[in-house]
Design a protein with these regions (language model features):
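A structural signal for multi-pass alpha-helical bundles of membrane permease subunits
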Residues: 43-345
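Short, Lys/Arg-rich, polar N-terminal cytosolic tail immediately upstream
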Residues: 1-41
């Protein structure tokens, strides 16, 4: 009895403690907190110290100009005088009633829809042929076409030239009287076929688009070639053993593994189509510029003309805001519709 009483008393004694050297158990569902080390405490100030300067520069030179542009779009600022007054949504109403704006927006949307498709499609085809599309050689399961290194240099060459020089060269080539294109047509006894090229409202936009394609394909050929070179050759060997042809290999193996690069290139090419590249080529090559009959006017050119040619900086920033919205919508759609499961190798 005494032993039972002593045992019971020991079990109910609130002052009882675990035996020395025995770890105290934590309650179920509660994780033991690990004390923060000195490295953990110093990590966040270290990261913040590296980010604060780039973020400050980004805010000053990117975010703040956007805010200013949106503010000036509600004014009648001429761009030459410090004096202006608020006009509310007057500039936006003027923009929606402006036929030239809608023509320019149509041309810009045409560029942003077609240029990425054409440029990336050609670049993917050429990259595949350079890296994978050649005949089998001894000691290599896959190989590119002969002279692939030379082709990479040739395709990338337009990137070395200034866009202004490229536009001037093609402007001379498109000259209906002394240009290279019509001279070639006359040389093959097609003298009756002498298009006006940049002087024809039905051809001018497509002639300029062809120049943009020529200047940009080489960059993406090199970009996609680098991506294809990083794909393990064992994957291609397995596909060949399974009897896959080039068409199947490209769409079932190469393209899925390059999809992240293609998606980024799509956004980048779309921004170029809406930005400085399109503006420079249209400004230099087209009649007017922007002609004939506004057949080649794009939104960046219209912004330039309104701000610096007609002294309507407030209205020009309104068109710039519309261009920003189009760019954001395009980027969002590409990132959303192009989302797919990430493949790793």
């Amino acid at each position: 009895m005494a032993s039972e009483h002593s045992a019971a008393g020991a079990g109910t004694d609130p002052a009882s403690a675990p035996a020395p050297g025995r770890a105290r158990k934590t309650a179920p569902g509660r994780a033991a907190k690990r004390p923060r080390s000195a490295a953990d405490r110093g990590k966040y100030p270290f990261v913040i110290g590296f980010l604060i300067v780039p973020l400050a520069l980004y805010a000053v030179f990117v975010i703040w100009p956007f805010i200013q542009a949106i503010y000036y779009s509600f004014t009648d600022w001429t761009g030459l005088s410090p004096d202006f007054k608020m006009v509310g949504f007057g500039n936006y109403k003027k923009m929606f009633d402006d036929d030239t704006f809608w023509k320019s927006a149509q041309h810009s949307v045409t560029y942003v829809v077609l240029l990425p498709v054409v440029v990336l499609g050609i670049a993917l085809f050429l990259s595949f042929m350079i890296n994978v599309g050649g005949r089998r050689r001894k000691g290599a399961a896959i190989a590119g076409v002969r002279g692939s290194s030379f082709y990479k240099i040739v395709y990338f060459f337009p990137q070395v030239l200034s866009i202004a020089i490229v536009a001037l060269l093609f402007q001379f080539a498109y000259n209906p009287k002394t240009g290279a294109l019509n001279s070639v047509l006359r040389g093959v006894r097609l003298g009756s076929v002498q298009p006006e090229w940049l002087g024809d409202p039905n051809l001018a936009l497509w002639c300029i688009m062809a120049v943009l394609v020529w200047t940009q394909v080489g960059f993406f050929v090199v970009l996609f070639s680098a991506g294809m070179a990083s794909i393990p050759s064992e994957l291609y060997e397995a596909a060949l053993l399974d009897g896959a042809g080039r068409f199947t290999t490209f769409f079932r193996l190469t393209l899925p593994l390059l999809w992240d690069t293609v998606q980024s290139g799509w956004v980048y090419m779309g921004i170029l189509s809406l930005g400085a590249e399109a503006f420079a080529v249209v400004q230099i090559m087209s009649v007017g510029p922007g002609g004939p009959a506004d057949s080649t006017t794009v939104l960046p050119l219209l912004v330039y003309q309104k701000a610096f040619g007609q002294g309507q900086a407030g209205y020009a920033t309104t068109i710039g805001v519309a261009l920003l919205v189009i760019t954001l919508i395009f980027s969002g759609l590409v990132m959303r519709l192009g989302r797919r499961e990430r493949l790793e190798f």
